[in-house]
Amino acid sequence: MRPIKLTISAFGPYAKETEIILDELGERGLYLITGDTGAGKTTIFDAIAFALYGEASGNEREPGMLRSKYADPKTPTFVELDFLYQGQIYHIRRNPEYMRPKDRGEGMTLQRADAVLEFPDDRLPVTKAKEVTKAVTELIGLDRGQFTQIAMLAQGDFMKLLFS
């Protein structure tokens, strides 16, 4: 599984819609994401894990905490991920549960968590959050725990790797 494009909106420190073209990094399979503390590096991992599994990459972040506190209340919170698996491109869009302005009148309303997985062939999309997580797990053969241990080396785990 190789991430191609990641789009995040009102997610973590990213207040506005931000697109990261991961495919431009090449096909070597190992990427190093560096930057200053608080620059949003871990959020990139969180967004990929959230798109695939509905949970952040670390155990200390609940889905309800993923909405950006810097975002305009009207900006929707979502993550989209295009990824390549066995020569086929899949698309996932997922949003956490969060409060948003009502469509009519004043006040806020709860935006329920939602997800959709689109296949590269003529299969119908999977449209329920739990079903998307199940379909992703079956497709790539890794659950969230396995994925975060194998595909990502999150902040704080680097020293564990060095001394193992």
Where are these predicted regions, by residue range?
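Extreme N-terminal "head/tail" segments of very large remodeling/mechanoenzyme assemblies
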Residues: 1-149, 157
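Cytochrome P450
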Residues: 161-164
